[in-house]
Amino acid sequence: MSIRVLTGITTSGTPHLGNYVGAIRPAIRAAGAPGTESFYFLADLHSLIKVQDPERTQRSTLEIAATWLACGLDPEKVWLYRQSDVPEITELMWLLTCVAGKGILNRAHAYKAVVDKNRSHGDDDDAGITAGLFMYPVLMAADILLFNAHQVPVGRDQIQHIEMARDFAQRFNHIYGGEYLVLPEAAIDEQVATLPGLDGRKMSKSYGNTMPLFCTREELKKYVFSIVTDSRAPGEPKEAVGSAVFQLYQAFAGVEECSMFAQALVEGLGWGEAKVRLFERIDAEVAPLRERYEDFMRRPADIEAMLRDSAGRLRERDAIPLLARLREAVGLRSLSLCMVSAVPVPQEKVALPVLKQYREQDGRFYFKLIDGQGAVLVQSRGFASPRDAGQWIALFKQVVSAEALVSPMLEPVADPVVVLAALRRLREAGLDLYT
């Protein structure tokens, strides 16, 4: 069993160095970590909320896909797919829409921000607001829940969307009486790197101070030399801390190189020479990526084929089976199977198995699966925290094969067939699977 981690990739705009350092590079380094199954999707349906230029939408999707591939995302090791290639996402969105509370959507940060802006201008609350913007959190929830993601890396400003996804999943599970949807967790990286822009403020498209990731070598040099610095002349000591030039250098150089660069500034290195060193350091890392990016951009058909193939395999493995189960749960069933029920024959009640989570005297947390007569079917090994144990329980609930019962975190299972039957009974009963 592995932890599923899902990352959405915005497909609007041109990637800049801030995107690369703060999001792309760390995400790719984390991809394919042991015990992790990584999902990356191009959020082209989301982009339609803001962008209604079809040529721009198409071009941007290609550029973003080429960017991530050029930076090292390996589609042989992770899942990379386009949102619009998985129609089950929008079908799940509708099922979630039918259980989502409007009051929760009213409190969505993005929607509230536009409402507040309209009010400050004396306009109607919903002036210029589309249903797409209002329903954005439900689409995001469908992205996450369709593939039973356990963790979603987000910034603190996105935590609300994960909480909404959890709420919608809980409502659905409660209404239809089963553990159909896994409740995701927000994975917050407190060390997300932010780069200064050309003017010293945070690099952001809204400030117009970005440096495109894959501009030409000559253009990159012009951008670097346009970074704002103080007026201290060559020979005068300069402070590295707070300098945009030094902060950018830190993002691309090792600790020893940064220490030498900082010392050179203190000893009077001129800003012109400092920018030359910065440019050479950035270009050393970006140049090979730029070549790969240009190669991918010359082969859009290959990218299209890869995205479609990945989406097709994911649909077959995960999306289609889950939607079939959800359709059955909500009653979207074949009418040929609809029969008038006969008078039910009373049956002897058989106690259901149960999952128990508990803490031992060693301070560690455990769980076990017990049958209706109290016999232990599965015993876990110890976990450091209740959260770790809970995440494994969430994975264990979905086990459908004997191979998945072989894990270093589980004691050897004596009879996998009995265990799988017990889990299946619990799922069919639609009960909470642990106490």
Swiss-Prot record:
Annotated residues for binding of L-tryptophan: 143
Record keywords, A-Z: Aminoacyl-tRNA synthetase, ATP-binding, Cytoplasm, Ligase, Nucleotide-binding, Protein biosynthesis
Localization in the cell: Cytoplasm
InterPro entries per UniProt: aa-tRNA-synth_Ic (IPR002305), Rossmann-like_a/b/a_fold (IPR014729), Trp-tRNA-ligase (IPR002306), Trp-tRNA-ligase_bac-type (IPR024109), Trp-tRNA_synthetase (IPR050203), YegP-like_sf (IPR036913)
Keyword flag Disulfide bond: no
UniProt xrefs under Pfam families: tRNA-synt_1b
Catalytic function, reaction form: tRNA(Trp) + L-tryptophan + ATP = L-tryptophyl-tRNA(Trp) + AMP + diphosphate + H(+)
The UniProt record lists the keyword 4Fe-4S: no
A GO CC term assigned to this protein in UniProt: cytosol
EC number from the UniProt entry: 6.1.1.2
Domain of life per record: Bacteria
Molecular function GO terms recorded: ATP binding; tryptophan-tRNA ligase activity
Motif stretch ('KMSKS' region): 202-206
Top EC category: ligase
Membrane-spanning parts: none
Location of the motif 'HIGH' region: 11-19
Residue sites binding ATP per the record: 10-12, 18-19, 155-157, 195, 202-206
GO BP annotation list: tryptophanyl-tRNA aminoacylation
Family matches, as Gene3D superfamilies: HUPs, Tyrosyl-Transfer RNA Synthetase
Protein role: Catalyzes the attachment of tryptophan to tRNA(Trp).
Record text on subunit structure and interactions: Homodimer.
Protein family membership: Belongs to the class-I aminoacyl-tRNA synthetase family.
Alphabetized NCBIfam families for the sequence: PRK12284.1, trpS
UniProt-recorded name of the protein: Tryptophan--tRNA ligase
Gene name linked to the record: trpS
